[in-house]
């Protein structure tokens, strides 16, 4: 009887975790309000190909993929987590990071093609292929070419 109970608990745990990692398409209007505002402000001319909710065990994130291949990922509260496109809007790049990159690396028409932020700071990729890592105080931590 104990073996059966342990087996049932294990099965429930496995299926619960599997179900917790659930992706589903949603309407843009179902995104958090902050995410909708962000899209209207910075990507108003971009056509959305797909919006989806990525549900994990404890929270959700949202991905918006554009017809031109660009993508924005949002946290559950609607704050942007990652922006990937041909030319990331400069207004979302912290000024110290943008100033550093334009002064030192973004000459001859290079653009920011990806920015990602998390609790440790920012990861930025420019169109030349170089990647930069900054801490939360916008200090350069690493360069990868």
Where are these regions (language model features)?
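Bacterial Sec-dependent N-terminal signal peptides
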Residues: 1-23, 39
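Interaction-mediating elements
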Residues: 21-145
């Amino acid at each position: 009887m104990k073996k059966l109970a342990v087996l049932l608990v294990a099965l429930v745990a496995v299926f619960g975790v599997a179900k917790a990692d659930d992706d589903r398409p949603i309407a843009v209007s179902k995104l958090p309000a902050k995410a909708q505002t962000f899209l209207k402000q910075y990507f108003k001319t971009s056509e959305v190909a797909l919006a989806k909710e990525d549900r994990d065990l404890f929270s959700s994130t949202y991905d918006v993929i554009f017809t031109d291949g660009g993508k924005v990922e949002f946290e559950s509260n609607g704050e942007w987590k990652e922006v990937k496109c041909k030319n990331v809007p400069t207004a979302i790049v912290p000024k110290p990071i943008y100033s550093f990159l334009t002064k030192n690396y973004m000459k001859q028409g290079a653009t920011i093609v990806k920015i990602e932020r998390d609790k440790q700071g920012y990861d930025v990729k420019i169109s030349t292929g170089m990647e930069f890592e900054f801490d939360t105080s916008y200090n350069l931590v690493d360069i990868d070419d």
